[in-house]
């Protein structure tokens, strides 16, 4: 798949087959994460945590549903793998750099999943719930001084990707000449 086609085809997938993510596909997704730009070259201050534990994902699902006041919902969408992006906590002047870098890492993983025909979805609610549930956060065993910044669910799906027309004016544009 070419880059522009992947961009036009990418969408949030919320249904998964129940199959595990293959080691080969995970390796490709992690390689895409490592290809992302990181502000000021601070790659050594970024960290990825791959969660394949069904028990952890169910606990995160429950915590997220409670936090969102939607008990009975499944905000992890039964995804088989969640990849958390964390970074070393920075002084406030640099925090935006790490947040932006984590977003780029997450987006690279989503685009790689799209290219591989896998489903992927940003899991912002899950990120918030895990970040605010000490028992779940501790299970991630993040490096000392690191905080969660992004979460991506990824796995096999029966859904297909179709390129869509992207309106050129979805985001307003201004300029200075």
Predicted regions and their residues:
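Short, charged/polar surface micro-motifs in flexible loops or helix N-caps
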Residues: 53-58, 89-91, 158
């Amino acid at each position: 798949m070419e880059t522009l086609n992947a961009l036009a085809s990418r969408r949030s997938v919320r249904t998964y087959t129940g199959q595990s993510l293959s080691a080969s596909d995970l390796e490709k997704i992690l390689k895409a994460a490592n290809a992302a730009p990181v502000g000021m070259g601070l790659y050594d201050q970024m960290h990825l945590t791959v969660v394949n534990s069904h028990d952890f994902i169910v606990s995160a699902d429950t915590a997220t549903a409670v936090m969102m006041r939607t008990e009975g919902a499944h905000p992890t969408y039964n995804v088989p793998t969640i990849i958390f992006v964390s970074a070393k906590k920075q002084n406030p002047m640099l925090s935006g750099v790490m947040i932006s870098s984590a977003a780029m890492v997450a987006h690279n993983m989503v685009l790689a999943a799209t290219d591989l025909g896998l489903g992927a979805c940003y899991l912002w609610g899950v990120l918030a719930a895990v970040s605010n549930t000490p028992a779940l956060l501790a299970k991630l065993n993040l490096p000392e001084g690191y905080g969660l910044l992004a979460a991506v669910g990824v796995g096999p799906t029966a859904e297909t990707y179709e390129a869509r027309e992207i309106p050129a004016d979805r985001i307003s544009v201004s300029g200075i000449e």
